[in-house]
């Protein structure tokens, strides 16, 4: 199975939820472009830890895995990699201190994280 084999319903969901749009809501990204954006963003991280990393080769590997539908990252990664928000996690673990103040600080922090995730 490959990118050209995805169903009409899958394309509909990608267009509604995942692909980049301009300020008027017009699509400005293709499915292929989304996979390239995600692959480039994921590969670029390696250069932070290894100055000799071949990020182009890594990006091509990620891209091929995604376009062959052998591996797809989680929704936040597909939606946000390479974009301003950059939120790639689908869940958070927040510490909660054993006090009323600590509990409400945790609630506040959770609300702030959730708010950023839906921007």
Model-derived regions, located:
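Extended catalytic cores of very large enzyme megasubunits
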Residues: 1-118
């Amino acid at each position: 199975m490959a990118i050209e084999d995805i169903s009409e319903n899958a394309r509909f969901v990608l267009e509604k939820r995942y692909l980049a749009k301009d300020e008027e809501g017009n699509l400005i990204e293709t499915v292929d472009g989304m996979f390239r954006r995600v692959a480039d963003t994921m590969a670029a991280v390696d250069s932070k830890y290894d100055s000799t990393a071949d990020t182009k080769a890594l990006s091509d590997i990620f891209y091929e895995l995604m376009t062959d539908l052998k591996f797809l990252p989680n929704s936040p990664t597909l939606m946000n990699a390479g974009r301003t928000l950059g939120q790639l996690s689908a869940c958070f673990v927040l510490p909660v201190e054993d006090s009323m103040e600590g509990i409400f600080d945790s609630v506040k922090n959770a609300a702030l994280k959730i708010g950023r995730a839906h921007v």
